[in-house]
């Protein structure tokens, strides 16, 4: 993106919202079924900001400082390939509402990513900045806990058939 763009909360709310019901799967082995999310696909951000052609990955930055700074990261960061964010089969959304209510603070308000086929730490909460990048960047969880891989698919035996 040649020129950074700031999108206020009301601008995000003005994007055509869609609803999606999906499950959330934590890396610790627990899941929550049938969460109703309301938000928009990442393609809406791409449409608004028109990233540079060489952007292959997206880095999400989270609000607040962490107690440690692995790899020099003092706040939560997560990275996903742009191609996955744009793939409708992955059902990835930026969400503002959860179960018919504004997204609660403990679930990532004002804005969080939902990536239902990835483990929960890829669904970064408290998003304050979105950066388009040429290369992937390791997330905070992967740097702090090398047992957490950068690619974190939910094991097939934990996915329900719909």
Language-model segments: residues:
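A mature extracytoplasmic/lumenal domain signature
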Residues: 11, 28, 39, 62-64, ...
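Extended, aromatic/histidine-rich regions of cofactor-dependent oxidoreductases associated
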Residues: 48-162
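A compositional/structural signature for long, glycine/proline-rich flexible linkers
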Residues: 1, 10-11, 22, 41, ...
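A glycine-rich, hydrophobic loop/mini-helix early in the fold
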Residues: 1-37
């Amino acid at each position: 993106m040649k020129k950074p763009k700031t999108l206020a909360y009301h601008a995000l709310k003005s994007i055509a919202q869609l609803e999606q019901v999906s499950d959330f799967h934590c890396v610790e082995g627990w899941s929550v079924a049938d969460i109703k999310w309301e938000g928009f696909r990442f393609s809406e951000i791409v449409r608004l900001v028109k990233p540079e052609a060489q952007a292959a990955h997206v880095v999400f930055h989270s609000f607040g400082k962490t107690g440690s700074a692995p790899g020099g990261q003092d706040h939560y960061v997560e990275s996903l390939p742009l191609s996955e964010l744009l793939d409708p089969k992955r059902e990835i959304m930026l969400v503002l509402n959860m179960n018919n209510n504004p997204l609660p603070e403990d679930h990532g308000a004002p804005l969080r990513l939902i990536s239902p086929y990835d483990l929960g730490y890829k669904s970064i909460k408290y998003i304050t900045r979105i950066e388009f990048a040429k290369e992937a960047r390791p997330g905070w969880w992967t740097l702090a806990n090398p047992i957490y891989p950068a690619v974190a698919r939910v094991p097939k035996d934990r996915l329900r058939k719909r």
